[in-house]
């Protein structure tokens, strides 16, 4: 592994990685072009009022996620909410090309780029770890509802049950972590003291969980409107199943481009639920395209806010 990392850091390794990424991107673009040439653009015959409603709920989900992430920092180290929104938008846009889990690197870089707080890289990484736990915990009620109300196969319901169980385990960790790092037996260790200074309280973690749950619900409502806009189905349980499958695939440690992985998982769950393969792929691609477009809007607005703030004249005390 060490040799592989050293090879990737070398000049030839970087060139090879860039070439491989370019070839992969061109290959995906060619396959997508062939697919759309044969089947047509998914949004060509969509109800654009419903598409607009879906985009609005996707935008709302970004806001809720930024508010939730904001709660996971210590009060003295919290970045501005717009910085966190920009990081989320950049990660979603980068997910169209970057491999799975690399979006966290983008988030850290963007938060540090804004430079509006005293958060170090380690603090941002810890907040992302907590955000991952809270994301999983917030999916628990949605996965349980999808498993209970979906007409899918037993295997699909079992998969939803696994996601719900993972959410329960994450909720337990969230509850115990602040007490664990503050334990008298562990506080003498430097790592435990560092964690104790930066780990949010259980109360703040549960507030973050409420915001993140609201973010997932807003996205599920947006997917429901998009299903109706494309004439796929008018089924909220199906929207929940698509959401849970896509979110669960994002947890894979190593995967192709994040957006492609989520689209593939979502399309697979639609096919397993009785939707035609071509229609399922079209919906998954359309959903990811709109999500990326909304994320790009969030990123542009946040970048404009950051630029305006940087050039705003400092207030002079009277």
Give the residues covered by each predicted segment.
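Short, membrane-exposed interhelical loops at transmembrane-helix boundaries
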Residues: 264-280
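Predominantly cytoplasmic-facing regulatory/coupling regions of multi-pass membrane proteins
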Residues: 1-90, 139, 144-251, 277-318
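Helix-loop junctions at the membrane interface of multi-pass solute transporters
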Residues: 71-76, 96, 107-116, 131, ...
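Structural signature of transmembrane alpha-helices in multi-pass secondary transporters
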Residues: 92, 131-135
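Membrane-interface alpha-helices at helix entry/exit sites of multi-pass transporters
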Residues: 82-86, 104-105, 116-132, 275-286
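Transmembrane helix boundary and interhelical junction motifs in multipass membrane proteins
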Residues: 63-69, 98-108, 136, 249-267
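Hydrophobic, aromatic-rich membrane-embedded alpha-helical segments
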Residues: 85-113
């Amino acid at each position: 592994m060490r040799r592989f990392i050293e090879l990737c850091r070398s000049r030839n390794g970087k060139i090879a990685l860039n070439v491989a990424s370019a070839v992969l991107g061109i290959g995906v673009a060619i396959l997508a072009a062939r697919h759309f040439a044969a089947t047509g653009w998914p949004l060509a015959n969509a109800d654009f009022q419903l598409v607009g409603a879906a985009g609005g709920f996707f935008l709302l989900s970004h806001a809720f996620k930024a508010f939730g992430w904001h709660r996971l920092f210590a009060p003295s180290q919290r970045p501005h909410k717009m910085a966190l929104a920009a990081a989320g938008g950049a990660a979603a846009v980068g997910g169209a090309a970057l491999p799975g889990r690399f979006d966290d690197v983008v988030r850290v870089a963007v938060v540090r780029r804004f430079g509006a707080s005293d958060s170090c890289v380690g603090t941002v990484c810890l907040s992302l770890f907590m955000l991952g736990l809270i994301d999983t915990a917030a999916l628990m009620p949605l996965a349980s509802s999808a498993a209970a109300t979906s007409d899918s196969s037993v295997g699909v319901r079992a998969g939803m049950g696994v996601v719900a169980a993972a959410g329960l385990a994450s909720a337990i960790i969230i509850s115990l972590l602040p007490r664990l790092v503050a334990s008298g037996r562990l506080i003498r260790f430097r790592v435990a003291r560092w964690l104790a200074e930066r780990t949010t309280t259980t109360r703040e973690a549960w507030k973050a969980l409420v915001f993140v749950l609201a973010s997932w619900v807003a996205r599920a409502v947006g997917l429901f409107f998009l299903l109706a806009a494309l004439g796929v189905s008018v089924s909220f349980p199906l929207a929940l199943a698509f959401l849970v499958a896509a979110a669960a695939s994002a947890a894979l440690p190593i995967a192709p481009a994040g957006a492609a992985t989520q689209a593939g998982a979502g399309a697979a769950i639609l096919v397993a639920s009785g939707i035609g393969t071509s229609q399922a792929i079209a919906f998954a691609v359309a959903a990811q395209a709109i999500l990326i477009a909304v994320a790009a809007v969030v990123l542009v607005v946040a970048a404009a806010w950051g630029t305006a703030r940087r050039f705003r004249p400092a207030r002079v005390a009277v």
